Amino acid sequence: MAEIALQPNLTADGNDGPAMLSTIRQLPRTVWLIGFISLVNDSSSEMLYPLIPLYLSSVLMAGPRALGIIEGVAEATASLLKLFSGVVVDRTRHSKPWIVIGYGLAAFGRPLIAFVTSWPGLLVIRFADRVGKGFRSSPRDALLAGSVGPDQRGVAFGFHRAMDNAGAVIGPLVASALLVAGT
């Protein structure tokens, strides 16, 4: 029987949990902060945006065409601005202002949904939120990559994605609990 070469920090039973936890704990504060911000941001986003179709149809009395316009404009905006912000950050090496503006647009814009009285108003708020995403995504990734050495980039990005995905799970759970409590 052939001998299996083990990866560093991987035990014979495949348990590398303690080594992985140690590696995660050693990540720089910047990576932890970006991860936490992403968790909170994604939680708030996933609390609201899955309810937009229902809000459009039952409160704003808009149809599927309005939803298509809103989401099409929003996602196209985010995609184009990611390219723009990436180019700007590569040239200037200043990522933090873009990240702050990007997350700030989301934080200030989302609560305004409560005051929207028409679907064009919702379009403006969703547009602003996606402008924020476009501004922050590439600079955030550049800051993450620059915060760790090449040997830790996979861990840093994996940790960030895990925190982001945790927010995507927490948000709908909180929204569901709030809806149940409010009925």
Please give the residue ranges for each predicted region.
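Structural signature of the two symmetry-related core transmembrane helices
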Residues: 97-111
